Amino acid sequence: MPLISDLLALCKLKVVALILFTAVVGMFLAVPAPYLPNGLLVLSASIGISMVAASAAVFNHVVDEQIDAQMSRTNQRPLPQGRVSKNQALVWGVFLGFIGLGILQLFVNIITVVLTFISLIGYTIVYTLYLKRATPQNIVIGGAAGATPPVLGWTAVSGTQGIEYACLLFLIVFIWTPPHFWALAIYRVEEYKKIDMPMLPVTHGLAYTRTQILLYTVLLLLVSLLPYLSGMSGLIYLVITIALGVRFLVYAIKIYNNPDDKMVAWSTFMYSINYLMLLFIALLFDHYWLISPWEIL
């Protein structure tokens, strides 16, 4: 029997935590201030979305077992080390996905079930099985699956009401994904070359990738203004998102100007995670900041 710690390692809990965070923010933004979403609904949706996200991570481990065994970043994972068999991982992944979708069906709503299932298929089959090995645009196209959590959170609480605002959150995460992963790909480019993975730095070179990171970061700065321009968010969000975006742009320029410095790429990758978290915190803070605690209660 595999250890619980190994089964949890297959779930990529840190990634799931970021997914859950953006989904929960989507839940709160779906409700007009000063109101809060139903607590049981938030809990049920959070558990269901998290379990399906963990299921997708497990399937990713199964599909990428041979690749993981060849990379220093991943060769200590449970499957390459033989601590969990492929069949055990498959059963674990199916269990998580089935229970997660079941919770969403029983306690949330059908549209969230459908969108979550589409995201699961998009990540595990379209991205992991095909795009990841077929095209250097794998991150761009496959990023759609990873950008859905805020939409899932929104629909869990409000269905399709106001879903156009949820689509703005989707767009932000979608545009954020390429510079986030390409920065990591630059840092790990030699390993990707070793396994012949068609990541952008491998197929098109570092210079082209650095340019794409810069262009996508500029686009992200512009797209992040849409919640303000659409009336979804206010000045507090606008100020914070501009500050975060300019800082991200500084990192992108550093990558562009320092082609041989892998640590700049790593620093950019790490900042991109903080960027997304802080941007969603800004959305939430702006949503409630004029409301007194007594109004919320």
From Swiss-Prot:
Reaction it catalyzes: heme b + (2E,6E)-farnesyl diphosphate + H2O = Fe(II)-heme o + diphosphate
Entry annotated with the keyword Plastid: no
Gene Ontology molecular function: any one: protoheme IX farnesyltransferase activity
Biological or metabolic pathway of the protein: Porphyrin-containing compound metabolism; heme O biosynthesis; heme O from protoheme: step 1/1
Membrane topology, as annotated: Multi-pass membrane protein
Entry's Gene Ontology cellular component terms: plasma membrane
GO BP annotation list: heme O biosynthetic process
Keyword Disulfide bond (UniProt): no
Pfam families on file: UbiA
Localization per record: Cell inner membrane
Keywords: Cell inner membrane, Cell membrane, Heme biosynthesis, Membrane, Transferase, Transmembrane, Transmembrane helix
Record EC number: 2.5.1.141
Family: Belongs to the UbiA prenyltransferase family. Protoheme IX farnesyltransferase subfamily.
UniProt-listed HAMAP family: CyoE_CtaB (MF_00154)
Entry function: Converts heme B (protoheme IX) to heme O by substitution of the vinyl group on carbon 2 of heme B porphyrin ring with a hydroxyethyl farnesyl side group.
PANTHER family in the cross-refs: 4-HYDROXYBENZOATE SOLANESYLTRANSFERASE, PROTOHEME IX FARNESYLTRANSFERASE, MITOCHONDRIAL
Protein name: Protoheme IX farnesyltransferase
Species: Vesicomyosocius okutanii subsp. Calyptogena okutanii (strain HA)
